Amino acid sequence: MGQKVNPIGFRLGVIKTWDSKWYAEKDYAKLLHEDLKLRNFLKKRLYHSGVSKIEIERAAGKAKINIFTARPGLIIGKKGSEVETLKKELAKLTEKEVYLNIQEVRKPELDAQLVAENVAMQLERRIAFRRAMKKSVTSTLKFGAKGIRITCSGRLGGAEMSRTEWYREGRVPLHTLRADIDYGFAEAKTTYGIIGVKVLLFKGEVLSAKK
């Protein structure tokens, strides 16, 4: 079970929490679609800003969006000019008042989503997939991760047949619910087709093991 399921979804309510924090009754579906629209827009708009996670909180007529990024300067812009433009664009997608909160990811090497996007970008630049995987694994472990596993899937190296290759170092316990495992997924659009990159990053155990 732990092998197949999304490690974050598997740990929700145990050691992980939801990215959308709001409650609704009748218009639940509408708000859910709105969330999806906002996330897709931000991912596309801030593609080069190293966005790791987007949290959405809602309260009476207001929507607070927390953006976790490795490059906050790119999003904020000179004297906050970029943020104001972004706010106006988001306000068009939702009927609510939008509040933006930009938070910096201090160690992008310890963020699974950013590691996955980094590997995907290297693959798009025609760097050999094994080299890209190894480089990311080494730098992540250097920054204090307990273990990491990177999987690349697709027409690797322009091969005729698609295949899956993975590289792991350290411990990545997928069944242990108290294990703090971060998960990231990115796609590399190469001339041979799309290559999927999955990253599982083990940061250590959260709850103390029962004696």
Curated annotation (Swiss-Prot):
GO terms for cellular component: cytosolic small ribosomal subunit. Keywords: Ribonucleoprotein, Ribosomal protein, RNA-binding, rRNA-binding. InterPro entries: KH_dom, KH_dom-like_a/b, KH_dom_type_2, KH_sf_prok-type, Ribosomal_S3_C_sf, Ribosomal_uS3_bac-typ, Ribosomal_uS3_C, Ribosomal_uS3_CS. Residues 38-106 form the KH type-2 domain. One of its GO terms (biological process) is translation. Pfam families: KH_2 (PF07650), Ribosomal_S3_C (PF00189). PROSITE patterns: KH_TYPE_2 (PS50823), RIBOSOMAL_S3 (PS00548). One of its GO terms (molecular function) is structural constituent of ribosome. Belongs to the universal ribosomal protein uS3 family. Binds the lower part of the 30S subunit head. Binds mRNA in the 70S ribosome, positioning it for translation. Part of the 30S ribosomal subunit. Forms a tight complex with proteins S10 and S14. This is Small ribosomal subunit protein uS3. The gene is rpsC.
